Amino acid sequence: MNPIILDAGDLLFTTSTLVDSNRSSEIYRGSAMIKGFDKIGCDAINVGQFELAAGLDPLMKIASQTSIPFISANLLDSNTEELIFKPYTLIDRGGIKFGVIGLTDLVSDTIEQLIVDDYTIAGNIYLSAMEGRVDMTVLLINSDRSTYGDLHEIFPSADLIFTSGSTFMTRPMMDQKENGPFVFSSGREGRYLNQVDISIMDDGGQIINRSYHEAKINYFKKRIDRYRDRDPGVPLNELYSEQPSILSSISES
């Protein structure tokens, strides 16, 4: 197995603002995190609000200490009006080519040296630029929890979206927009991982979120088993003949 390892942002520090009392320890933490990811292996880190908690210069110093690409498609240098980081990275793994784009909606535009472009416009520009160049497009988005429900409409041509910026976590049983893009959230500070296994059965076909359907089947199976435990030898339609609500639930399962 040779997985693609990505971070959607808010990795380096534990807060969006550093002060004298925590600056040294937080910068040490950020450097230690990068050293750890260097050993583990990481294919891209999206620049989120926490990455800029110490300012741009400390972030650039940390980024210079690693070969891991920091990406951002909507953070510009205020002096040159050019992107500070590469907007995306291309990854070829297992015969599948991925285009991974970094975006943020949480970084304050009051930070010196920084211009924050509209992440929705920047994201769609680079998604369009990748058409025909990659098999799958992946967005790493650092944004508020309130935006997650709209991301599939904002970026309809994306395949997978991984978010940071809140403690919200997706579960396999959570329903996703049919045909994608599928949105995944892993909480905060790298405490949890979202593992997505991808199999391409039909090039150009629709994307199916298999984990949701499997979780749903397992849930209904357990529910029917609980109903059957009451008297395993009696058919369910006889066992609950006088309980139409349960029969309806069994039928739905």
Model-predicted regions and their roles:
Residues 1-253:
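Acidic, metal/ion-coordinating pockets
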